[in-house]
């Protein structure tokens, strides 16, 4: 049986914060031997202090394989700490060890090829059968084509569910932790085989102001027509509706929710920035390629809608684990959520705790999130992604 425990602490000295957090995680895990530790360390700790963080965990939990990344904030099921001096630790052990973590240096230069190499390694570690398994990656987002990297993994292991997040960091950038060191331009992957019943749930922080509409003409990243009409006319019509009046003054905060005709279910879209195209003032430019046949809805960050969507996601996750209760969770939480969305920290962890009780959960403020949408693993923004397993 797999056992888990979490702990968190805040201290300006990384070694001290990590030692306290690891001790709390170890105590929460009980008497079982801990074989793995996932560490999220506040980005206020510089490179030297990250080494101290990792030494603190290794000294407190000797023999454990330690992985993780930097973050501007961390969370557990009990709290969300928007403080760059915080450290959170998830301790895992028992008689059901996880597969060894996967690690890659140099992910920027050819992101798709680097992703494909990681995907092949994951598939080999699963003896060629990725069905029902989940790969959670933590990656330095600096100068990275994240979409290409994830696509490379999917090319090599099409049955593998991919989740995870981009690390977040301070002025010196983000770091990924492996083998007692902190690396830029790197990725660590944690494999959760089907035997652990891993599931991934995603919740949107941006809720639709409109219903999904079909893109009927597009070129590159330009939306030329929506249901046969000018996208600008569609947008102006949406903003003129009584419930949306006043939003015209904050159109810079509106985002496009891009989905597919076949998209079904709650929040099955990806959120992307958009702007009026410079070359064609009747078209919209979106921050990724689009094609005719996809759908678009205009969205806005919405605390009330985000809370309701979070509750719906948690209900879905609970139902998925009716027959196999989860033993731990990892929550990848966009840095644009928390107090930036709700006005105060801690709401998402509180909702997780209400739904799952004292389930050990650890999480980070991430630069982007990865979760399935529209039939494939996608890069997300303003989302919360919850991985449950065990």
Functional labels for PLM-detected ranges:
Residues 1-58, 63-342, 346-359, 364-390:
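Small-residue-enriched flexible segments
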């Amino acid at each position: 049986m797999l056992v888990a425990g979490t702990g968190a602490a805040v201290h300006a000295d990384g070694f001290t914060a990590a030692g306290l957090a690891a001790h709390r995680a170890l105590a929460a895990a009980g008497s079982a031997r801990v074989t793995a530790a996932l560490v999220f360390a506040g980005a206020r700790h510089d490179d030297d202090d990250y080494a101290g963080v990792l030494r603190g965990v290794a000294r407190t939990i000797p023999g454990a394989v330690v992985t993780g990344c930097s973050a501007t904030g961390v969370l557990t099921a009990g709290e969300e700490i928007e403080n760059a001096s915080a450290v959170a630790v998830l301790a895992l052990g028992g008689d059901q060890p996880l597969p060894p973590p996967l690690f890659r240096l140099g992910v920027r230069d050819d992101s798709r090829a680097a992703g494909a190499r990681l995907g092949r390694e994951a598939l080999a570690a699963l003896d060629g059968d990725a069905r029902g398994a989940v790969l959670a990656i933590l990656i330095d987002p600096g100068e990275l084509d994240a979409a290409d990297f994830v696509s490379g993994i999917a090319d090599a292991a099409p049955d593998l569910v991919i989740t995870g997040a981009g690390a977040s960091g301070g002025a010196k950038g983000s770091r990924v932790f492996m083998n007692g060191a902190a690396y830029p331009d790197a990725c660590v992957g944690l494999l959760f085989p089907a035997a652990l019943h891993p599931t991934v749930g995603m919740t949107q922080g941006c809720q639709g102001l409109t219903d999904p509409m079909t893109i009927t003409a597009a070129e590159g990243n330009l939306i030329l027509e929506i249901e046969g009409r000018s996208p600008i006319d569609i947008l102006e019509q949406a903003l003129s509706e009584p419930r949306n009046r006043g939003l015209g003054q904050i159109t810079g905060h509106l985002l496009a929710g891009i989905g597919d005709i076949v998209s079904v279910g709650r929040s099955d879209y990806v959120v992307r920035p958009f702007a009026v195209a410079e070359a064609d003032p009747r078209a919209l430019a979106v921050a990724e390629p689009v094609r005719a046949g996809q759908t678009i809805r205009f969205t806005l960050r919405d605390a009330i809608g985000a809370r309701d969507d979070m509750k719906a996601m948690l209900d879905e996750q609970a139902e998925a684990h009716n027959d196999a209760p989860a033993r731990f969770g990892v929550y990848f939480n966009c840095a644009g959520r928390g107090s930036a969305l709700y006005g105060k920290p801690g709401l998402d962890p509180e909702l997780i705790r209400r739904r799952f009780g004292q389930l050990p959960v650890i999480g980070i403020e991430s630069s982007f999130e990865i979760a399935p949408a529209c039939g494939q693993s996608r890069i997300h923004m303003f989302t919360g992604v919850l991985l449950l397993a065990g």
